């Protein structure tokens, strides 16, 4: 069967649909045939074959595991074939192609999630044995596999699986920690001695994989990590290592120097900034960093100490600086945002699904702002009110920087609307300033018109009096005019929706505006193209 599988896999990689479609159909028919996955294993483990054929084989194997490896899966793989494959998959860790090595590691991890340790108790001991060995490439592949296996096992949340993972952690943590320490030390010594980058790469890659393994073990493998001697030793060492690495980083003056200059500021560590801000958010929101009740009633001394440390760090001065920095630096629309507005305003208006705070800097900073504002409202309310007073007056339409600052402040005020209920006289602000800003029609001022629509929508359910709602409806109808910028019109729609969804909404108040609103919405519906917008 191997020769036939190789031929069909080769056809499945063709650019000719007349060749591709029949090959895909044949592979689909073979998915449930006995011996198919053994044949796929034979193909991708044969280093003499073309990489693209081996790549197709491992992908089909991986997809087959998702569909047919479970015991109760329809047309599932037979147990004797699964046992054979489990043995063969961990018999050789010398895959020379990095991309295939990664796919193999993910494949083994998928099987481990179903079978380890009950049906595959030799997996972890085999990986540890290879890691202890002297074969450099096999050691790297085993570490890569161990990382993905630990990641897969850590994701299982049933109580029995959690206990099994805690047992696994107890058995391997000392070895993994010592091995990580060894490779990290080796990397730092090589780096300080000016060793060639190609030689440094090997210990660095292995140290990084071990660090990823340690992260999963420590986070998910201990009920109380602070009681583990290994965990506490790791935390002590990691801060020392971080300091050393940051000092050594200063010597990197060639390829990465540009990133640390003003010209390269846009390239500098955005992913790192996101990680740092998310760490701060996690500390602010963690139940382990604040007592359940009063500080004097908490029985856990670690919780009390963590709370005290948090309060000592977040002083009035520190909070003021953080809040001001978040709003006036990280909330600003960027040139890329403005370019997107010009080219694809619908995409700018649609909120990302999923969890954008994990990868998007603005989404991340907004959540950090909310977390810190909720926790320290008594301090930060006055800071934000001061920013409002500083930026609430109309600005010159030609002064783009002032417009962007005003937009950022209004964004913060909208996000913190509920926390500012007693601090802001929104009716007065609406009547004297906000409605007037909607009348400024310069191109740059579309930024403010859009933000004002959004801001009023956020406050409509918080503190917009009933007597002002008719005027609000009229302003939003004007903002929906076909002559208005599309970004502003989409913000006006959202504002209207929030007001209509509010429990204080009265049908009779809105009836005079219903026909014109519906007509404008229908006109806009014909203009937009994105399904999310529609």
What are the roles of these predicted feature ranges?
Residues 1-534:
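Karyopherin-beta/Importin-beta family HEAT-repeat alpha-solenoid scaffold
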